[in-house]
């Protein structure tokens, strides 16, 4: 990364290894007022308490924020006028949350701050705890109960569902989950190396997968229940550079400095290439047969056009809050409509 600073030591610009430039502008209080990525600006406004009051993106869509006297976020107003609201008690705990897209949810707490009940519409779920604050019972809206039991270290060792089915859990000395036993007698188990990496998993049917790691705890091989081995090698940045399957077929991968996949080459030499915009958005995929898929975006990164080859394309449109409203292709147009709460209705 290359950084440029002003006389106050604030970052003015940042250039990543791919050449993407992010520039910063500040207000009189030293707060970031503008962030520009390759010419696309996002604006920030603040209230008197230095809370973010509004964010306007490169498509001129503004989201506004409001807070109570304690600095708790109480309201988010979206570009279409819909809003999320949140109410708090004197201790700053959420007691009522009303999203723009659904029913309000109310919360009740005990003296220790544990949630005692969650109410959404007419549905109430209740919770009970032991003296250590661990959940021991959940009573669902239909009155059914799920109970929980713990060992002295606080590990969950038992769970009983509303039908009375018991699931038991056991652990290693390091409190790593070692075995799960179900009500029907079936079980799953795990084994670990000294570093805590899973080296074996046995499922309820008795099938065991084994895992191998290198000195820096990167997975280097997976051996399935039939003995088939898949091996992994990594580059200097810990990206998977090579995968060798059980038939010794090798697939190789390369990446740019930001970790974006650049090429994928299979055992037959067929190569798929990937290219990205300066912002890191996928710009094109070139397949082994020469077919090129391209992607176009708006200033905020919403996908506008997918050119899928043979002159065919898929175009997408969005509303003022970034939800897709229309997808068009040679096969026709799909229109998406939302209700007042933001739910997709058609």
Regions found by a protein language model. Name each.
Residues 1-16, 20-57, 61-78, 82-99, ...:
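Beta-strand elements of repeat-based all-beta scaffolds
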């Amino acid at each position: 990364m290359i950084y440029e600073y002003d006389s106050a030591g604030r970052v003015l610009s940042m250039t990543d290894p791919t050449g993407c430039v992010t520039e910063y502008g500040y207000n009189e209080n030293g707060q970031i007022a503008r962030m520009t990525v390759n010419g696309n600006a996002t604006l920030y406004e603040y209230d008197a308490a230095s809370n973010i009051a509004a964010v306007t993106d490169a498509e001129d869509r503004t989201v506004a924020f409001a807070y109570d006297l304690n600095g708790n976020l109480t309201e988010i107003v979206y570009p279409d006028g819909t809003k999320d609201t949140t109410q708090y008690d004197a201790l700053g705990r959420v007691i009522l949350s009303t999203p723009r897209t659904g029913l309000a949810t109310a919360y009740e707490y005990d003296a220790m701050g544990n949630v005692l009940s969650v109410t959404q519409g007419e549905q109430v779920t209740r919770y009970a705890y032991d003296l250590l604050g661990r959940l021991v019972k959940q009573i669902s809206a239909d009155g059914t109960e799920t109970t929980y039991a713990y060992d002295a270290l606080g590990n969950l060792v038992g769970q009983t569902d509303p039908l009375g089915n018991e699931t038991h859990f056991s652990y290693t000395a390091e409190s790593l989950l070692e075995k799960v036993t179900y009500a029907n007698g079936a079980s799953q188990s795990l084994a670990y190396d000294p570093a805590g990496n899973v080296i074996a998993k046995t499922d309820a049917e008795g099938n065991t997968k084994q895992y191998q790691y290198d000195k820096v705890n990167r997975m280097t091989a997976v051996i399935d229940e039939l003995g088939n081995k898949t091996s992994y090698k990594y580059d200097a940045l810990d990206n998977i550079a090579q995968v060798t399957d059980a038939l010794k077929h090798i697939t190789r991968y390369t990446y740019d400095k930001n970790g974006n996949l650049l090429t994928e080459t299979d055992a037959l030499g067929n190569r798929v290439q990937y290219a990205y915009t300066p912002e890191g958005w996928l710009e094109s995929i070139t397949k082994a047969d020469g077919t090129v898929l391209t992607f176009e975006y708006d200033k905020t990164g919403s996908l506008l056009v997918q050119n899928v080859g043979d002159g065919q394309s898929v175009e997408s449109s969005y509303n003022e809050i970034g939800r897709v409203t229309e997808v068009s292709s040679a096969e026709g147009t799909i229109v998406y409509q939302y209700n007042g709460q933001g739910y997709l209705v058609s």
